[in-house]
From Swiss-Prot:
Its main location: cytoplasm. It catalyses: Endonucleolytic cleavage of single-stranded RNA in A- and U-rich regions. Endoribonuclease that plays a central role in RNA processing and decay. Required for the maturation of 5S and 16S rRNAs and the majority of tRNAs. Also involved in the degradation of most mRNAs. Keywords: Cell inner membrane, Cell membrane, Cytoplasm, Endonuclease, Hydrolase, Magnesium, Membrane, Metal-binding, Nuclease, RNA-binding, rRNA processing, rRNA-binding, tRNA processing, Zinc. Residues 39-119 form the S1 motif domain. Mg(2+) binds at residues 302, 345. It comes from Haemophilus influenzae (strain ATCC 51907 / DSM 11121 / KW20 / Rd). This is Ribonuclease E.
């Protein structure tokens, strides 16, 4: 049987334990000095708005300011006329000095302040009230099946005010609508008291404090499976009995006072189990152990097999140890109330089925936990990651403090290493200008090491830097701590060395930080909430309605058997009736839960959103109707032009062709009609007057097949124009479409059109005649025969006024300025032709006529005297120049004689291992660095 044990014999600590038999499975400890602030309601003041973080910092009365993100700001704090698109700007919503009602969402942890929210939630016995969050609400995720449907019906019958959200807790299962309505009435009355108290005085102050551990334990842990509540303090027993009588009268008979001689927790043998929650290492029944280390980022858990010998082989031993560790880890997480990221290093298991078995075991073990837990699979490194919701400060945070000696690291530096570090720090302080004395306050062990083993080093520092170093031991100081003070000229202290520790300690106590911390300690007064609790605020004469015992409608055993037999012969229609079980629920519940459904998430107001959606729908409908209407009008006009008979009857019989959603764009159209509405109006006007119809529409209809024929002839694939060309209203350039310059240029001159790319030159390839420089032997012999046979007389040749092979570029404008260039080129060609043999003299002059005899000259007969005696082959007609090979001049340098010397032994000798190096040398030679000289 499960029991709730409440130990309140010591006023400094109140403990609540939940046991199943003699096994502890949940624990809650609260001290008067460590009350949790979570769920407390404060009236705070905005001190700073940070747009980069999308958050504001709130002074709510604590030492550190709270953190209020933008998503946690309720809609009621937005200005009335504030309209935004996308994400709102936090500077437009909150201003510095504004007062807000906030609730602590997460406790302070380390250097982080508390996380706050303006969406207040008040927890009752059966319900959770969210007064300013109407979108939130529902039923607890732990409630399933028929119980869930019953609670939905009960919720629908409740009288809930507008703008209020409700969540039904697991304790509300099986409660009547009257009991739920009573709990709602208590919570609403409590919220009214909170609003009245917030207007009583200015911020910051505490409005509502979360209930103490007794009320909280009764509210959170009191379930139907708890059979007994034992309390060992008469005062706490009376308080708990009154509270249970008011909120849960059906549990009044289960509250009992423990009066045994043996302490309550020792009677059920759970003291040793509670002590295991404070230890770093926890033993397993098989002999293994788990080691739990809490860090700033995560909680690391390591599993060691140690002396575990369960199993026949190593794989079975690892599996059994991991299964035991999975149960114990889930239990320790509840006892220690560890939250955040948890990483478990299981013993390596090779079979995949063993890994899945361990994963399933840990999922089953964490199922009774109140916190939300997410578990991943075991990775290839043997690690399992899981996250646990942080409900309250962990057991270590609430009952432990950081060690003043090691600062929470658990390790202390070695004496010798610490002494050498202090020695280096002393020399750094002595190096500073205007230093007269350096004082160091160290523990006794460090002072002994510095004044004996390192005496020479301290004296050398004093001589080099001309300072005085004083080492003063302090008995109250422990190893890792020390202090170094630097005194300038005129600040010398003429005190005895053993009094320096007291003097410097007194100076440290008078610093600003120490005075501030002492003021905080003296002024720290426990705040009293303006509203004590819902029970105190309400003067309700009547308690919660007692649950009416319902007559069990369960049939007898015989009736069940008969019903089962009938069920076998029932029709299929009865089987297909929907059942209210978990499978009928929305499978996307987790996704819906992850979304924040608060009003701050809606970026636009409802009015603007509805207006915009209506406009969008109207525009889409009009756009879809324009094209079919225009096509119908054009077709009707064309038919009316061909046939004089009315077209309306045929129009009804003819099926309209379905227009494509996206037609191909015809790139050959040069004129586009953008105003569709005007076209439709004109077409409608033409349909009214049938005799005035023109044939223009028929021509438009004939255009389409012409383009289609052209496409079929060319057989080219049209691709969609890229987006960057469509934006610039350009077209894709084809291969056959050569770019033509809109502004022809006669030469590649520098012009703004050419530089900007508006004009370009046609660089089409010109096929020049190839000159054959190499002749075969036959061709060469034929040329020689023709030369021997006859001598051609010199004749005048009439040349037309055309440039022989040079043609102007297309779209070029020839100018007279180019004629002089051509004449100069022609003169240079004539000059080169004069070097040929004087057989034929050709005078190429376009101005000479044929009839003039002055151009004729007589040439003497050419007699060949050359005889060929070599080999026949391909002979090049291109002249070649040859030159003899030359040698590069070299300087006359005589090589020097290489000196030959006898080998000489070294003066240094090696004396064996450990005798080498600078510190073991007999003599040393030093030389100053030299600089290379440049000639």
């Amino acid at each position: 049987m499960k029991r709730m044990l409440i130990n309140a014999t010591q006023k400094e600590e109140l403990r609540v334990a939940l046991v199943d038999g003699q096994r502890l499975f949940d624990l809650d400890i609260e001290s008067p000095g460590h009350e949790q602030k979570k769920a407390n309601i404060y009236k705070g003041k905005i001190t700073r708005v940070e747009p980069s973080l999308e958050a504001a910092f709130v002074d709510y009365g604590a030492e550190r300011h709270g953190f209020l993100p933008l998503k946690e700001i309720a809609r009621e704090y937005f200005p009335d006329d504030y309209v935004f698109q996308g994400r709102p700007n936090i500077r437009d919503i909150l201003v510095e000095g504004q007062e807000v009602i906030v609730q602590v969402n997460k406790e302070e942890r380390g250097n982080k302040g508390a996380a706050l929210t303006t969406f207040v939630s008040l927890a009752g016995s059966y319900l959770v009230l969210m007064p300013n969050n109407p979108r939130a609400g529902g039923i607890s995720r732990r409630i399933e099946g028929d119980e869930r449907t019953e609670l939905k019906e009960a919720l629908s019958s409740l009288d809930v005010p507008d703008g209020v959200g409700l969540i039904v807790r697991t304790a509300g299962v099986g409660k009547s609508p009257e009991e739920l309505q009573w709990d709602l009435k208590v919570l609403l009355h409590h919220w009214e008291a909170i609003k009245q108290a917030s207007q009583s005085r200015p911020a910051p102050f505490l409005i509502h404090q979360e209930s103490d551990v007794i009320v909280r334990a009764i509210r959170d842990y009191l379930r139907r499976d708890i059979g007994e509540i034992l309390i060992d303090s008469p005062k706490i027993f009376e308080k708990a009995k009154e509270h249970i009588k008011l909120v849960r009268p059906d549990f009044i008979n289960r509250v009992k006072l423990y009066q045994g001689e043996v302490p309550l927790f020792s009677h059920y043998q759970i003291e040793s189990q509670i002590e295991s929650a404070f230890q770093r290492e926890v033993r397993l029944p098989s002999g293994g152990s788990i080691v739990i280390d809490v860090t700033e980022a995560l909680t690391a858990i390591d599993i060691n097999s140690a002396r575990s010998t369960r199993g026949g082989d190593i794989e079975e031993t690892a599996l059994n140890t991991n299964l035991e560790a999975a149960d114990e880890i889930a239990r320790q997480l509840r006892l220690r109330d560890l939250g955040g990221l948890v990483v478990i290093d299981f013993i390596d298991m090779t079979p995949i089925r063993h890994q899945r078995e361990v994963e399933n075991r840990i999922r089953d073990a964490v199922r009774p936990d109140r916190a939300r837990i997410q578990i991943s699979r075991i990775s290839r490194f043997g690690l399992l990651e899981m996250s646990r919701q942080r409900l309250s400060p962990s057991l270590g945070e609430s009952s432990h403090h950081i060690c003043p000696r090691c600062q929470g690291t658990g390790k202390v530096r070695d004496n010798e290493s610490l002494s050498l570090s202090i020695l280096r720090l002393l020399e750094e302080e002595a190096l500073k200008e205007n230093t007269k004395q350096v004082h160091t306050i160290v523990p006794v062990q460090i002072a002994s090491y510095l004044l004996n083993e390192k005496r020479k080093a301290i004296s050398n520092i004093e001589k080099r830097h001309n300072v005085d170093i004083i080492v003063a031991p302090n008995e109250a100081m422990e190893t890792p701590h020390f202090s170094v003070f630097r005194l300038r000229d005129g600040e010398e202290v003429n005190e005895l060395s053993y009094n320096l520790a007291k003097i410097h300690c007194a100076q440290d106590e008078n610093t600003e930080e120490s005075l501030l911390s002492r003021n905080v300690e003296t002024t720290a007064v426990i705040e009293q909430p303006a509203v004590e609790s819902a029970v105190v605020a309400l003067s309700i004469s009547e308690a919660a309605p007692t649950p009416v015992e319902r007559k069990s409608n369960e049939p007898s055993l015989l009736a069940k058997i008969i019903a089962k037999i009938k069920g076998l012969f029932a029709t299929k229609s009865e089987e297909n009736k929907p059942k209210n079980n978990r499978t009928s629920r929305n499978p996307n519940r987790n996704q819906r839960r992850s979304q924040d459904r608060r009003s701050s998430r809606r970026p636009r107001s409802e009015n603007n959103e509805t207006e915009r959606t209506e406009e969008q729908v109207r525009n889409v409908r009009e756009r879809n109707q324009r094209r079919p209407r225009r096509n119908l009008v054009e077709e009707s006009i064309a038919e009316s032009a061909v046939n004089s008979t009315p077209v309306f009857e045929a129009k009804e019989e003819r099926t309209e062709p379905v227009t494509q959603r996206r037609q191909r764009r015809d790139l050959r159209k040069r004129v586009r009609v953008e105003d569709n509405e005007t076209v439709v109006e004109n077409n409608f006007s033409t349909t009214e007057k049938m005799p005035e119809v023109d044939v223009i529409t028929v021509q438009n209809n004939d255009e389409k097949p012409v383009h289609q024929n052209q496409r079929s002839e060319r057989q080219e694939r049209q691709r969609r124009t890229p987006r960057h060309l469509r934006a610039a209203n350009n077209q894709r350039r084809r291969r056959d479409q050569e770019p033509k310059s809109p502004m022809p240029l006669f030469a590649a001159v520098v012009s703004p059109e050419l530089a900007s790319g508006k004009a370009w030159i046609d660089y089409s390839t010109v096929n020049l005649p190839k000159e054959n420089h190499f002749l075969s032997v036959d061709e060469l012999l034929e040329q020689e025969k023709t030369k021997k046979g006859f001598i051609t007389p010199a004749m005048g040749i009439v040349v037309e006024e055309k440039s022989p092979d040079v043609k102007p570029a297309l779209d070029f404008i020839t100018q007279p300025a180019n004629e002089s260039v051509q004449k100069k080129v022609q003169e240079s060609l004539d000059r080169l032709s004069s070097y040929k043999p004087q057989e034929v003299v050709e005078s190429i002059d376009p101005a000479i006529n044929v009839d003039e005899p002055e151009t004729l000259e007589k040439v003497s007969k050419f007699v060949r005297t050359y005889e060929f005696n070599g080999r026949l082959g391909t002979i090049s007609s291109v002249p070649h120049t040859k030159a003899e090979m030359t040698l590069a001049k070299a300087n006359d340098e005589m090589p020097e004689d290489f000196p030959i010397r006898a080998w000489q032994d070294s003066r240094y000798y090696f004396y064996g291992k450990g005798a080498a190096g600078h510190h073991c040398a007999i003599s040393h030679v030093y030389s100053e660095p030299t600089r290379t000289k440049s000639e």
